[in-house]
Amino acid sequence: MKLAFDDFLNSMSETNTTLDYFTDFDKVKKNVAQIEIHLNQLNYLLGKDDLKQAVYDLYAECPNAFSILEILIAVRKKEQKKSLDEKGQVVTLNSYFQSADKIIDFLNNTGLADVFRDKNIKNLVDYVFGIEVGLDTNARKNRGGDNMSKAVQLLFDNADIYYKKEVRNTIFTDIESLGADVKQFDFVIKTKRKTYVIETNYYNSGGSKLNEVARAYTDVAPKINQYSQYEFVWITDGQGWKTAKNKLQEAYTHIPSVYNLYTLHGFIEQLNSEGVIKDW
């Protein structure tokens, strides 16, 4: 039995995060490995009293070593960051890496020169590993949606529910009215009664995106549900929905199968009662 909307809203979870959400160490290690040779070359500068001469010497031997200096101030090369130079001109950061004198200006003006001389850093590979961990926190927002999919997948797995993930809508040729509304579904589950096409998402905070999603799925659901052998299922969660209560309530009223992580057990019970098909 479907929960009353207020009960559904109040059962929204505070988080969908697992411990692997906070830092993607595989990505961190990959990013560090890509520049590790240059970092070890730059290690030559650490602790040098005459840093200026050390830069000249290293630049003469390995000019490309300095091409990664931006990461030492937590800036990625692809960002093409700009700053004002000593003449007040707008320049890109990588323009400082075209000569030894410019590199010395960069080190002095960013404060890295003092850090290098004072031996505050022992090894630039370890230092950049820490920077990469910090920068990776910016990707957490993107991992939120993936984490919801993982949470749903875990519940399906624990219940021994067979599913397919990220299924293109083109395999459902008999759903003529779908068009390009949903290019692929997060999960598809078949039972002896019907095929369930499932979308999942999670919102920690509010914004116009929530209203757009609720409106879109309210439109999509009847296009799919008009075919008796199919049913659209929306699994969503997060405290952000409390800022878009009205639009969610409208969707909850019009879409027969809307669940969150708390109520999903009801859908799983329904699937088991219908008999999940595994050989498709």
UniProtKB/Swiss-Prot annotation:
Catalyzed reactions: Endonucleolytic cleavage of DNA to give specific double-stranded fragments with terminal 5'-phosphates
Protein's UniProt keywords contain Hydrolase: yes
GO molecular function, one term: type II site-specific deoxyribonuclease activity
InterPro entries according to UniProt: Restrct_endonuc-II-like (IPR011335), Restrct_endonuc_II_DpnII (IPR021191), Restrct_endonuc_II_DpnII-like (IPR007637)
Keywords: Endonuclease, Hydrolase, Nuclease, Restriction system
Family classification: Belongs to the DpnII type II restriction endonuclease family.
Name of this protein: Type II restriction enzyme MboI
Native species: Moraxella bovis
Gene name of the encoded protein: mboIR
